[in-house]
Every structure is written in structure tokens, then in C-alpha cells.
């Protein structure tokens, strides 16, 4: 897998037709990286929540799965009056990690337990 950077994501977005629309203005590159790594190693994720063609919950999961050509489930949900569609080329991809080291450890532990994997393996595949 190529490195996940704002440039590689922008290039990916311009060269692919992404069926679902974003409703979030910013996404976190380190989270996308970790999710791509986990998906590539068979770790399962919850479905994303979609209303019509809008992502309501699961932007990082959706884009990560799309980048690595991984099938991710979708469940219907409702939107609110505040939900606004955003073109993917207007979404800002930030380098700052939104997850604390403690949260990363917690999520890795959950994923290891749920997928019956050793925690050290999950830590290894998600470290840069």
C-alpha cells in the first residue's frame, strides 16, 4: 500500500468516482492510515450509516475502504437539517492525529479482542 498523505488522498479523489458524498469538512490522515492497515489485514469494522447518498457516520471507514478496494457494509439512517453534502475535493485532510495514544491503544485492544488477534500484531500493523 502506498503511503497515505494529503497528496496521495487528493490524487485518489480526483482519479476516482466516489459514489457517496461527504458531510464532514475534515478527516484525519493518521486515522485513515490505521484503518487502511487494519482492513488490509482482515480486521472487521462496523457498517457506515448512510442517508440517500450521504455519509452520516463513517467517513474515515468509508474512504479507507474505498482506497484499498475493501467492501464495507452500509446501513440506512436519517439525516438532520444540519446535514450538508460536501464534495470530496473540498474535504480537508489533516496530518494532526485526532486520537490520543490512549485512545489508539484502546481501539487496538478492542479490534484485537473482537477479531481474535494478538494485540502486539495490531499495534505493529498500525504503527508508522
Spell out what each predicted region is:
Residues 2-56, 60-66, 73, 78:
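Short alpha-helix boundary/capping and kink motifs at helix termini
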Residues 47-128:
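Basic- and aromatic-enriched surface patches that contact anionic nucleotides/nucleic acids
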Amino acid at each position: 500500500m502506498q503511503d497515505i498523505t494529503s497528496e496521495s488522498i487528493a490524487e485518489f479523489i480526483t482519479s476516482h468516482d466516489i459514489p457517496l458524498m461527504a458531510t464532514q469538512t475534515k478527516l484525519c490522515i493518521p486515522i485513515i492510515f490505521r484503518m487502511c492497515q487494519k482492513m488490509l489485514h482482515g480486521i472487521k469494522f462496523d457498517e457506515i450509516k448512510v442517508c440517500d447518498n450521504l455519509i452520516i457516520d463513517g467517513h474515515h471507514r468509508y474512504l479507507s475502504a474505498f482506497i484499498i478496494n475493501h467492501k464495507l457494509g452500509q446501513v440506512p439512517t436519517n439525516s438532520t437539517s444540519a446535514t450538508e453534502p460536501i464534495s470530496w475535493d473540498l474535504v480537508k485532510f489533516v496530518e494532526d492525529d485526532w486520537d490520543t495514544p490512549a485512545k489508539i491503544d484502546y481501539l487496538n485492544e478492542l479490534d484485537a479482542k473482537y477479531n481474535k488477534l494478538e494485540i502486539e500484531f495490531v499495534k505493529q500493523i498500525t504503527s508508522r
